[in-house]
Amino acid sequence: LGDVYKRQVGGRVGSDGIHGATFSSLELTEESPSSAVQIGDPITQKKMLDMILEARDEGLIQVITDNGAGGLSSSVGEMAELTGGAKLDLGQVPLKQAGLSSWEILVSESQERMTVGVRPDDCEKFEALASLHEVEATAVGEFTDSGAFVVHHGQTPVAHLPIHFLFDGCPQLNLDSEWSPPTHLPVETPELDEEGMGKLLARLLARPNVASKEWWVRSYDHEVIAQSVIKPFCGTNHDAPGDAAVIAPIQGGTQGLVISNGIAPRYSDIDSYAMAAASVDEALRNAVCVGVDLDLIAGLDNFCWPDPIESSKTPDGRYKLAQLVRANRALDDVCRAYRLPCISGKDSMKNDAMMGGEKISVPPTLLFSLLGNHKDVRKAVSSDFKKPGDAIFIVGETHQELGASELAFMLRDEGSGGIGGDVPDIEPERNMKVYRALASSMKNGLVSSAHDCSDGGLAVALAECCFGADSGASIDISPLQSDCSGLDDWGALFGESLGRILVSVRPSEKEAFEKSMEGVCCHYLGLVSEGDAISISRDGEKVLLGSMSEMRDSWKNTLHGGGL
């Protein structure tokens, strides 16, 4: 890097975010400090990002990293490995408040800050660009080849650490993992007539994992600068759930960006491999629903895990570590099969707390986020049914997979049976063929709506699509028996098999759509209907009948912000 000066760019350092990295690696208690949580400033972030991108395009940046875990101590320390040393003067660092001690300035993780390396000849241009964007860019030190990371606060020495110690001084842990598949009581399903099944679906729609998140989402503005094409909610009343966001960042342009997520922590109770695989597939499936370009996608893996290190407080550490190993194997297997590179991610490995003398741990969880290109946002597809008379299809195979499903947990919570053992299996090659065929149909304008089947299975997905159109639906699930000879009504309606998307098509496009989906699993189920009823049959007999208005009330009144 030669003679390169360090610049802190963006927000100021404050007392927020101090020991944030430590906080995320320790057991939570009532004494855990709130100051470890960073305070966001999206306006400063936006100004800084615009300035950084312009500086990049002008060739003014030699090296850059964000001030995440450990703040300046990590960002400067990490980049110092490139040159073999660095000098840092904490007295030059802009502060939110006076009185911070040297160590607090060094480790604070206050948000919206980048550490940037700039050549001396480019410093004037860099600072002028920062001024233009109203962004602070302060010289805080320089890179050296001294072999040490040297920190001062003005004239006062703070730290002098050999570079080799920073990167090689801590030996890597050698840990043992031990996987033993857990056993659970089987799912026990009740005997219900069609109206009883309708009421059960209404209860399922009220479950927190399924219920409308509208009150939460609308607490924050998702319409800033009017770039959103597919929004969090869609349909006649703008309250039906969308699968993914589509934005058009270039005004007047037709190219867009798709952002989606997948998360399935329930499956970890049976197998964390299935959990991670389902999370990746859900994120991709959600993106497919809006018309993503499957050849331009990338992922971010965010792990949220209970303590996986065996100790007196965590006697099952070997098992939790084995869960982590299995989740990473799934991430590797599925992302390679989908040709889906992971470009970033995060982990938090100590999500445990003592409450009332009892240890509470989060379920092993992978939140998988996906970014993708949309070639033409004018052809983006939303999840809501459009018109009565439209044909309803399901693409992808349905199997008898109720293990750890939302239905299984609801029935268990109501006092009936366990969560079973048959978690959804994944066939990424088969799924990708379905996704590509559907993407081609969307490109040709054959698809009116698309919504993924995930929490609650086909029945929940069907109800959510009806919410968007203020409509009903009448379908026959008999064709699904060709996917799985042992498929019963419960598996067909509430199983959460991966790789499935519920689609509606205009009557005039039905034949063309069926032709475009030849060679992959695609079943015609029925029609969008006028009125308030959702009706599901199998082999000529009604298996579920319910009122959409009652289901909407159940769905919207769980997470409603205290009735506001």
Q: How should each PLM-predicted stretch be described?
A:
Residues 6-564:
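Glycine/proline-enriched, intrinsically flexible loops and inter-domain linkers
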Residues 1-5:
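Short, small-residue-biased leader/transition segments that mark boundaries at the very start
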